[in-house]
């Protein structure tokens, strides 16, 4: 332990919780830049869309993605016949990043007393906030800066009433996803690669069987114990059950998740201050508070995400609508 120049009184040090720290030195050793990347790791882990969508490199001005349209064909010919000509075409999609941000406010005493726990809590809360906002925008278009999202599809099938009449009790969840919904996709030249379902569908899935009498949803053996979602398979397609998919009567989506791309610009940026004045109210009813006057600390976290759904018709909405209850 260091001592003061008089060699008699112990010097507690600038980071000791008993020292009334002020200014930048208050955060020395608390918020290291290398710890910021963990925020993205948590966000990527929690976001269900980011589990299935393709991640692409993203620059500050966006990304132009080339896309091949049309098929190349070949024909059998006889000796001396004119060779057929085939053409293809390339188009591109420009995807722009959008900023997402949040500010955490806590008392300086709390930070000084237990900095490790404060940072851990903040990491979890930031990750959850970012992931939820991203998924809500990508799935349902809620407060979305992105022009495309899954809910824009017009294809729809009910898990509890596959034929939409409420009169055929012999139809099951298997008929809904593996027959009716799949037919909507393949008849339009689309694929079924993955499925997203809300936790609200668990009672529906628990008793569901395939045509061989096996459970329709087979949970992954290697799912993490504390995972924020359940991972498994339906008809050999990777499937996720999570608590923030549903919106109204829509409880899930199945389709070609290769049509989804997302990216992030650089790393996480954060600022720490105890000198600003923040509006802790709303724009309509502001409540401006001086951090310095009230001995508060604010941490601003920002990130830039991009998302694009290339083909909304490659997805089918799964609902819990029952015609007999309408």
Curated annotation (Swiss-Prot):
Primary location recorded for the protein, binned into one broad class:
virion
Q: What does the UniProt entry say about where the protein is found?
A: Virion
Q: Which SUPFAM superfamilies does the entry link to?
A: Major capsid protein gp5
GO (cellular component) term, any one: viral capsid
Q: Which Pfam families match?
A: Phage_capsid (PF05065)
Keyword Transferase assigned to the entry: answer is no
Keywords from the UniProt entry = Capsid protein, Virion
Subunit info here reads: L5 head shells are composed of gp17 subunits that are extensively cross-linked.
Please state which protein family the record places this protein in: Belongs to the L5likevirus major capsid protein gp17 family.
UniProt-recorded name of the protein = Probable major capsid protein gp17
